Amino acid sequence: MKKILVVEDDESQRILYHDEFADAGYEVILAANGREALKQLDVGKPDLIILDIVMPVMDGMETMGRIIREYREIPIILNTAYSSYKDDFMSWGAEAYVVKSADLGELKAKVREVLGESGSHP
C-alpha cells in the first residue's frame, strides 16, 4: 500500500483528503503545517507528499526546500488555492502543481501519475 503524507492547515481539507485517498486504497498520514510534516518524515518516509503552500508555522515553500535537501527522492505535489505560486521558481522543485478545487479529480489523477499508477485504483 502506497503511503501519502498530506500537509494541509485547513482541518476540513485534511479530513476530506484523508477520507478520499484512504478510500482509494492509500495509507494517509496528516500534518497541519510544515513543522509537523518534517516530524512525520523523521518517523517514516511516504511515497508521495501533497503539500499546501500557505500555512502557519512553516509554509509550503520553506517545507519543500527542506524536504528536497534531505529527502530528494520523495515526490511532492503542490496543492494550493493560489495559482500565482506556479510561477515561483521554488515551485519548480515539485513534481506537479494542482490548484485546489471542489473536485478532487485532477489531484487524484496527478497522484496516480506521479506514483506511476494507471486507472482509478492504486
What residues fall within each predicted segment?
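Conserved phosphotransfer cores of two-component systems
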Residues: 42-44, 66-73, 92
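Alpha4 helix (beta4-alpha4-beta5 surface) of REC/receiver domains from two-component response regulators
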Residues: 62, 83-100, 105-109
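Conserved acidic carboxylate
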Residues: 8
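Acidic catalytic/metal-coordinating carboxylates
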Residues: 33-36, 59-62
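Two-component/phosphorelay signaling modules centered on CheY-like receiver
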Residues: 11-29
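Receiver (REC) domain active-site loop signature in two-component systems and cognate sites
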Residues: 55
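Active-site residues of response regulator receiver
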Residues: 52
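Hydrophobic/aromatic residues positioned on beta-strands within the core alpha/beta folds
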Residues: 77-79
